[in-house]
């Protein structure tokens, strides 16, 4: 069993923002399998799918990005998941738009959702999939206004294709492991 955790903010006003691309990734995968989200045993929503004999629990924390660790710990405890069973999906403004970056472990790299998960787990030892949202220069309104901003039409087109490939990368992780997925998906989406 794998826990696939897409990070984002739960309110409707954050829908389709750059910061919610993690939510969009698990929503796209759930939709591809016709799996609805329902309330989990904690502050998260969960959808269940099965792929090639592997059960995947798709998780959307309802705690806001900066407190995601609470929902991750609750989901891990309820589903008896190990750190090696989880993949956290989040935005990364330091990666070019449409680039996927899988890692087996590492720092938060300035991403506050990852930072809180690391603090809550007491470890950086869990897989993550960062989706590049392409900050090219410091935005006038600051970083918050950028990550909480909506995608432009061109950016949305790139993200739609990126989410298709992201779905493949998640399934590859679930079946073949993080190293295999890293070797096949750590690149810009074309």
UniProtKB/Swiss-Prot annotation:
It is found in: Cytoplasm. The record marks 9 as: Discriminates between blocked and unblocked aminoacyl-tRNA. Coiled coil: none annotated. Transmembrane segments: none annotated. The active site is at 19 (proton acceptor). One of its GO terms (molecular function) is peptidyl-tRNA hydrolase activity. GO terms for cellular component: cytoplasm. One of its GO terms (biological process) is protein quality control for misfolded or incompletely synthesized proteins. Keywords: Cytoplasm, Hydrolase, RNA-binding, tRNA-binding. Monomer. Belongs to the PTH family. This is Peptidyl-tRNA hydrolase. It comes from Chlorobium phaeovibrioides (strain DSM 265 / 1930). The gene is pth.
């Amino acid at each position: 069993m794998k826990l696939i955790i897409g990070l984002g903010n739960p309110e409707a006003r954050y829908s389709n923002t750059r910061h919610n691309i993690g939510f969009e990734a698990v929503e796209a995968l759930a939709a591809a399998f016709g799996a609805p989200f329902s309330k989990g045993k904690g502050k998260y929503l969960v959808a269940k799918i099965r792929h090639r004999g592997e059960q995947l629990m798709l998780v959307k924390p309802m705690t806001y990005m900066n407190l995601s660790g609470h929902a991750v710990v609750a989901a891990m405890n309820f589903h008896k998941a190990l750190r090696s069973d989880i993949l956290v999906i989040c935005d990364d403004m330091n990666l070019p738009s449409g680039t996927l970056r899988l890692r087996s472990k590492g720092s938060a790299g300035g991403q506050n959702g990852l930072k809180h998960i690391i603090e809550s787990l007491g470890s950086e030892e869990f897989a993550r999939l960062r989706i590049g949202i392409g900050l090219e220069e410091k935005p006038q309104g600051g970083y918050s206004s950028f990550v909480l901003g909506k995608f432009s039409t061109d950016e949305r087109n790139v993200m739609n294709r990126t989410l298709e490939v992201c779905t493949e990368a998640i399934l590859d992780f679930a079946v073949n492991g993080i190293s295999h997925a890293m070797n096949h998906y750590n690149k810009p989406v074309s």
